[in-house]
């Protein structure tokens, strides 16, 4: 069972650049082509599908994202990020309603749980008692892989850690005594991991751009903005489950040299 994770596509209207540099539609199209070459059994998008649905009409952004993602050969699961809206995401991807957009399903003995951490008006995420019911309903005793947009703890990134997560202690209690193999996140625009609450919290690299890991804290940044971002070759996080062990790989899917043969 191979589960591919993508995150933070920050879709704009077709032809519109993100931060004047990145074409999200073209980037997502390349990402879909790469995913179809890899052939995962499932794709999970861990949020910020749109770039500014939280501040303006996100329908054009979601329409572009839905059109491109419809080209995926594998089934798709989506979670909202802080730049998304539940209504917009649900309408574009066939999940109408005002409820939380989580999921819980079994795949070859591995329980996959997607938690909705969106809290409108907040950059940081939140898990409330209602959202945690999805996880608490999972029978104990089997392995669990959790997906969510926001990491539930500081990740050692001064800028992004300045937007705190609400509900981390409750999540830690909910996973206590469970075999939670990993909490797979996005949000921070960096490839970074941290041991927390007896498991590993892992943020995947963004599909749009990366933030330097040593950016100063929000309060110390001019105008409250990071000094800059980098546009890097696309990477995809792969979670491979063989029925007993989870192996996680980050693969670069474009602009690499080689492979070169080893000299004799």
Residue ranges of model-derived segments:
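Active-site glycine-centered loops adjacent to acidic/histidine catalytic or metal-binding residues
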Residues: 8, 47-48, 81, 149, ...
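Surface-exposed cleft-lining segments at the edges of enzyme active sites
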Residues: 14-18, 50-53, 117-127, 153-162
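His/acidic metal-ligating clusters that form di-metal
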Residues: 31-42, 124-202, 235-238, 242, ...
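Acidic, His/Gly-rich catalytic cores of divalent-metal-dependent hydrolytic chemistry
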Residues: 203-264
């Amino acid at each position: 069972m191979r589960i591919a994770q993508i995150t933070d596509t920050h879709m704009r209207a077709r032809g519109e650049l993100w931060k004047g540099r990145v074409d999200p539609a073209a980037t997502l199209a390349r990402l879909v082509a790469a995913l179809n070459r890899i052939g995962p059994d499932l794709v999970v998008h861990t949020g910020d599908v749109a770039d500014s649905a939280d501040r303006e009409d996100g329908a054009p952004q979601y329409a572009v994202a839905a059109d491109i993602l419809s080209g995926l050969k594998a089934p798709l699961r989506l979670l909202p990020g802080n730049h998304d809206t539940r209504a917009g995401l649900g309408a574009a991807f066939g999940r109408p309603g005002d409820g939380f957009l989580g999921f819980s399903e079994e795949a070859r003995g591995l329980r996959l749980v997607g938690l909705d951490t969106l809290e409108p008006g907040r950059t940081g995420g939140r898990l409330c008692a209602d959202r945690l019911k999805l996880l608490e309903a999972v029978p104990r005793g089997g392995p669990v892989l959790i997906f969510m947009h926001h990491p539930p703890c500081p990740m050692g990134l001064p800028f992004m850690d300045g937007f705190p997560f609400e509900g981390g202690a409750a999540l830690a209690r909910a996973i206590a005594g469970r075999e939670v193999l990993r909490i797979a996140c996005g949000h921070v625009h960096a490839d970074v991991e941290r041991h927390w609450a007896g498991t590993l919290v892992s943020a995947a690299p963004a599909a749009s751009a990366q933030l330097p890991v040593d950016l100063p804290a929000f309060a110390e940044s001019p105008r409250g903005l990071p000094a800059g971002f980098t546009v890097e070759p696309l990477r995809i996080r792969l979670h491979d489950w063989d029925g007993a062990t989870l192996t996680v790989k980050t693969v670069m899917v474009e602009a690499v040299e080689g492979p070169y043969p080893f000299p004799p």
